[in-house]
Swiss-Prot record:
Pfam families: KH_1 (PF00013), PNPase (PF03726), RNase_PH (PF01138), RNase_PH_C (PF03725), S1 (PF00575). Its cofactor is Mg(2+). This is Polyribonucleotide nucleotidyltransferase. It comes from the Bacteria. Involved in mRNA degradation. Catalyzes the phosphorolysis of single-stranded polyribonucleotides processively in the 3'- to 5'-direction. The lineage of its organism: Bacteria, Pseudomonadati, Pseudomonadota, Alphaproteobacteria, Rickettsiales. Residues 561-620 form the KH domain. InterPro entries: ExoRNase_PH_dom1, ExoRNase_PH_dom2, ExoRNase_PH_dom2_sf, KH_dom, KH_dom_type_1, KH_dom_type_1_sf, NA-bd_OB-fold, PNPase. Its EC number is 2.7.7.8. Residues 630-697 form the S1 motif domain.
Length: 838
């Protein structure tokens, strides 16, 4: 049933397997490539274009489903959505590697889909996907020049050792992350990030990748010979020489005059006029109805014009030794730089190079603003974000704005790679950094203008970069043995040239390199020359930038979020957070600060102003502090009981305000004066390991100040007064029977409605009085309560006299019986007054 073709080879320290004939047999070409546990299904389908076009309608899509790593997608729908940035970047790598290998003039629709089936962190998926796409094209029968292979390259600087297809762990210590693609004869594509490597080290990486890709190209060729069911279709482009030769010398002169315009807007206007005129002439000449009809179609006219125009301009550059706009090969366009031009931005820069302009703006945020990336290679948090925007008005077009496309994502990532190696560590600069590049004008090299503008804006923000970073786009025009390497290319030079070579870096070395080749036969000697010329241009641009701002500002601006850290006991983390995050939310709402708590007890506080940070610190300090007797705290009533109210304070602390400590007057029920959720001020009056006793009546609830709170005079109800004073803080005598006297810290007699009560404080009271129908009995130095009657009064001893060492006067005696008379009163010696409050 299956006609399977399989090829296996050892590549590096892993096994590479290419297989076809089992899966996706309806596709024009389909292969499964496995390398070290990473597997990709690559398919290719081609069909005739529905309408005549003058370009190659090639689409490349790399898809990474979560099943490749044994996961279920997050979110409500549990299904993959739009491609991630990582998938988009891998799709671009494949596209840029295979697009130059289709024959010129080929306009059939081609769709390449690479589906990640399995992922292992030891093997990069882009390597496997490109090999799969190349093999699928090789067996599809679609016109395709030759196989292509790619590899990821790492570099251990201290050892001077290059790594083939490094694992994720190896990349974490590598000074280089490069993807290199080639054919059997030439370099095709390079994408890399480096930690300030020299030109020689980068060239060595290119040569290393070139050598190791060669064996895979041979394997793909052998596999295609075995698996191919039919020979590749031969594409014969239309012979356009007749059309090209018919273009007169007057049009040649008009094109050269138009291209000599230095300003892009004027140049484009003149070129459009010449092209429109020539197109009309050629249509009349070659597409008019005649006997037998024309052998040409409209797109042939377009191809012929492009070929003529490209050949004319390239020859002029090589012959005259000057550029389209009159510059020398290594000359940089005029540069204008301005920083700090947007008042409310955290940092800004306007970088203008010729007719290319980037307005770059920065914003700093807290670690809570970090981007959470949920990818097939694991979840991570990204603290540096760089977004590149290319609106239509940048090139004078009137069209609708659309979400960022592949080009914008790719250019933004290139600029990100250029800046990332010079950023400070999170420990040195814990902010989340976002850079936005708005391309306001474009005439080539807008991604490198973004690099320069981003470096300037970050320094203007106060981000301590290691050094300035500049970028430059290089071009190449090659005809036979003649070639010209162009610095700081225009958009037209990019379109008409053979190479787009972008280099970014510092004075110390290269941080990013991107290269796309359109022709074969570029050797490493030419690349070495291009790297050296790019270095000179990079230094020239950095010098211009340093004249405006050479070092990062000493401090961030006032309206940038401030941040401070404090360390709390790990056991107190729950107190700061509170039930369901209540406490930390309240702190954020009241102060306007943002708070982040780590498991080790580190608390990061972020706020725009110093006052907000200090307020948040004070609130956190209050929560984690141990309560102290005699101190006042803010709290909230959390529970009501018959005997009092429970109040939470200092975060999760809970204490009891006894009913007698709520107010200075009698209350019938706690619910009459308090409700759950009330904000109150409390004084800690006593505490032990498990219980905290609080008082409200001793605090002015409006001001939060402690007040001079004396015991109030109790009212006598159906009873008989029992002397002048009771306890050390009383003024009037305590009552018996139904008299209500607060009990607690103040000692003395304390009676309920049935006449119960007697107490002491710190051993000061020598006896405890009791009320009852019978006579009293002695209770020396104890804190016992005796039986209570309805209204009679009994003294401590039969003599009817009572003494208290801590009172101003002592109570007397009462007769036996329900309506006994007052006993005699004997005043005791006055005792020194103790402090009433903490």
């Amino acid at each position: 049933m299956f006609d399977i073709t399989r090829k296996c080879v050892e590549w590096g320290d892993r096994s590479l397997t290419i297989e076809s004939g089992k899966i996706a047999r309806q596709a024009g070409g389909a292969v499964v490539v496995d390398y070290g546990g990473t597997s990709v299904l690559a398919t290719v389908v081609s069909q005739k274009s529905k309408e005549a076009v003058d370009f190659l309608p090639l689409t490349v899509q790399f898809l990474a489903k979560s099943y490749a790593v044994g996961k279920i997608p997050g979110g409500f729908f549990k299904r993959e959505g739009k491609p991630s940035d990582r998938e988009t970047l891998i799709s671009r790598i494949i596209d840029r590697s295979i697009r130059p290998l289709f024959p010129s003039g080929f306009s059939d629709e081609v769709a390449v889909v690479c589906n990640l089936l399995s992922y292992d962190a030891s093997s990069p998926p882009e390597t496997v996907a490109l090999i799969g796409a190349s093999a699928a094209l090789a067996i599809s029968g679609i016109p395709f020049h030759c196989p292509v292979a790619g590899a990821r390259i790492g570099y251990i600087r201290g050892e001077g050792r290059y790594i083939l297809n490094p694992s994720a762990d190896e990349l974490s210590v590598s000074a280089l992350d490069m993807f290199y693609a080639r054919t059997d004869t030439s370099i095709l594509m390079v994408e890399s990030e480096a930690h300030e490597l020299t030109e020689a080290e980068m060239l060595g990486a290119l040569q290393f990748g070139h050598e190791h890709c060669e064996e895979i190209i041979k394997v793909i060729g052998e596999f295609a010979e075995e698996a191919r069911k039919c020979a590749p279709a031969e594409f014969v482009p239309c012979d356009l020489s007749t059309i090209i030769d018919s273009i007169g010398s007057d049009y040649k002169e008009r094109f050269l005059v138009a291209y000599s315009e230095k300003e892009k807007k004027a140049r484009v206007a003149k070129l459009d006029a010449v092209r429109a005129s020539l197109t009309e002439d050629l249509r009349v000449k070659f597409l008019s109805e005649s006997e037998g009809g024309s052998k040409y179609i409209a797109q042939d006219i377009v191809y012929a014009m492009k070929t003529f125009e490209r050949s004319l301009v390239r020859e002029r550059v090589l012959e005259s030794k000057s550029r389209i706009d009159g510059r020398a090969y290594d000359q940089i366009r005029n540069i204008e730089i301005e920083v700090d031009l947007i008042s409310k931005a955290h940092g800004s820069a306007l970088f203008t190079r010729g007719d290319t302009q980037a307005l770059v703006i920065t914003a700093l945020g807290t670690p809570q603003d970090e981007q959470i990336v949920d990818g097939f290679d694991g979840d991570k948090r990204e603290r540096f974000l760089l977004h590149y925007n290319f609106p239509p008005y940048a090139v004078g077009e009137a069209s609708a704005l659309r979400p960022p496309g592949r080009r914008e994502i790719g250019h933004g990532k290139l600029a990100w790679r250029a800046i990332h190696p010079v950023l400070p560590s999170k420990a040195d600069f814990p902010y989340t950094i976002r850079v936005v590049s708005e391309i306001t004008e474009s005439d080539g090299s807008s991604s490198m203008a973004t690099v320069c503008g981003a470096s300037l804006a970050l320094m203007d923000t106060g981000v301590p970069l290691k050094s300035s970073v500049a970028g430059i786009a290089m071009g190449l025009i090659k005809e036979g043995d003649r070639y010209a390497i162009l610095s700081d290319i225009l958009g037209d030079e990019d379109y008409l040239g053979d190479m787009d070579f972008k280099v970014a870096g510092t004075r110390e070395g290269i941080t990013a390199l991107q290269m796309d080749m359109k022709v074969k036969g570029i050797d490493f000697a030419v690349l070495g020359t291009a790297l050296d010329q790019a270095k000179e241009g990079r230094f020239f641009i950095i010098e211009k930038m340093d004249r405006v701002i050479k070092e990062s500002r000493g401090a961030v601006r006032e309206h940038v979020p401030r941040m401070e850290s404090m360390l709390i006991d790990k056991g107190k983390i729950k107190n700061v957070i509170g039930a369901g995050g209540k406490n930390v939310r309240e702190i954020c709402e009241k102060t306007g600060a943002k708070i982040e708590i780590s498991q080790d007890g580190t608390v990061m506080i972020y706020a725009v102003g110093r006052e907000a940070i200090e307020s948040a610190k004070d609130m956190i300090t209050g929560i984690v502090s141990e309560p102290e007797v005699g101190k006042i705290y803010s709290g909230e009533v959390c529970e009501l009981a018959k005997y009092g109210a429970f109040v939470t304070f200092l975060g999760a602390r809970k204490g009891l305000v006894h009913i007698s400590e709520i107010r200075n007057e009698h209350i019938n029920a706690v619910a009459d004066v308090l409700a759950v959720g009330d904000k109150v001020k409390v004084l800690v009056i006593d505490m032990d390991k498990d219980h905290i006793q609080l008082s409200m009546r001793r605090i002015d609830q409006e001001t939060g100040d402690q007040v001079d709170c004396e015991l109030y005079a109790p009212q006598r109800r159906n009873g008989v007064a029992a002397g002048n004073t009771v306890g050390d803080s009383s003024v009037n005598g305590g009552g018996a029977g139904s008299v209500y006297v607060p009990r607690g810290d103040y000692g003395g007699a304390s009676a309920g409605r049935n006449g119960r009560g007697g107490g002491k404080r710190d051993g000061a009271a020598k006896s405890s009085s009791s009320a009852g129908n019978g006579g009293g009995r002695s209770s020396s130095s104890t804190r016992r309560r005796h039986s209570a009657g309805s209204s009679g009064y009994s003294s401590d001893s039969s003599s009817g006299n009572t003494k208290s060492s801590s009172s101003e006067s002592s109570g007397g005696t009462g007769g036996r019986g329900r309506n006994g008379a007052n006993g005699d009163v004997q005043n005791g010696p006055a005792a020194p007054k103790k402090p009433r409050f903490f």
